[in-house]
Curated annotation (Swiss-Prot):
UniProt xrefs under InterPro entries: Aconitase/3IPM_dehydase_swvl (IPR015928), AconitaseA/IPMdHydase_ssu_swvl (IPR000573), IPMI_Swivel (IPR033940), LeuD (IPR050075), LeuD/DmdB_bac (IPR011824), LeuD_type2/HacB/DmdB (IPR011827)
Name the record gives this protein: 3-isopropylmalate dehydratase small subunit
Upper lineage: Bacteria, Pseudomonadati, Spirochaetota, Spirochaetia, Brachyspirales
EC annotation from Swiss-Prot or TrEMBL: 4.2.1.33
Organism, as annotated: Brachyspira hyodysenteriae (strain ATCC 49526 / WA1)
Matching HAMAP family: LeuD_type2 (MF_01032)
Keywords, ordered alphabetically: Amino-acid biosynthesis, Branched-chain amino acid biosynthesis, Leucine biosynthesis, Lyase
Catalytic activity: (2R,3S)-3-isopropylmalate = (2S)-2-isopropylmalate
């Protein structure tokens, strides 16, 4: 599995209340959530993001409230994966459960800049910064997590395995 896109970069401690503000949690409509993704820290995010783009954060990305609305909003906005130095554990699990690819890589988080073009090889854990001609190494997912992400989430993975 690979992803390629331009980077939307944010800092440390990007919490779920910033990813999708609480005032929008009264909807389960994924497109509506995506329409408000990141608006409190990047009002033009929805206008700038293109399908396949990549989000990069710093330490503790996705901290705060335990809500799966946050990774849903990111995924539905068109982001193909999130790279960060570290993730809040509940955000990490929620992301995998809804099929949003995420990778922890401190070096990539620090060296990648906003608007860099990046290609991610999930099978080998390689993050290539095309703009800077640099490659960073992340720990690839084990096979069972790859299966969940490739199935577009945990529920689909379970449905597909029952054949």
């Amino acid at each position: 599995m690979k992803a390629k896109g331009f980077v939307h970069k944010y800092g440390d401690n990007v919490d779920t209340d910033v990813i999708i503000p609480a005032r929008y949690l009264n909807t389960a409509n994924h497109k509506e959530l995506a329409a408000h993704c990141m608006e409190d820290i990047d009002k033009d995010f929805v206008k700038k993001v293109k399908t396949g783009d990549i989000m990069v954060g710093g330490d503790n990305f996705g901290c705060g409230s335990s809500r799966e609305h946050a990774p849903i909003a990111i995924k539905e906005s068109g982001i193909s994966c999130v790279i960060a130095s570290s993730f809040a554990r509940i955000f990490y699990r929620n992301s995998i459960n809804i099929g949003l690819a995420i990778l922890e890589c401190d070096e990539a988080s620090k060296k990648i800049s906003d608007n860099d073009e990046v290609e991610v090889d999930f099978d080998n854990g390689l993050i290539k910064n095309i703009t800077k001609n640099e490659t960073y190494k992340a720990e690839p997912f084990p096979e069972f997590i790859k299966k969940i992400i490739n199935s577009n989430g945990l529920l689909n993975s379970i449905k597909n395995s029952k054949g």
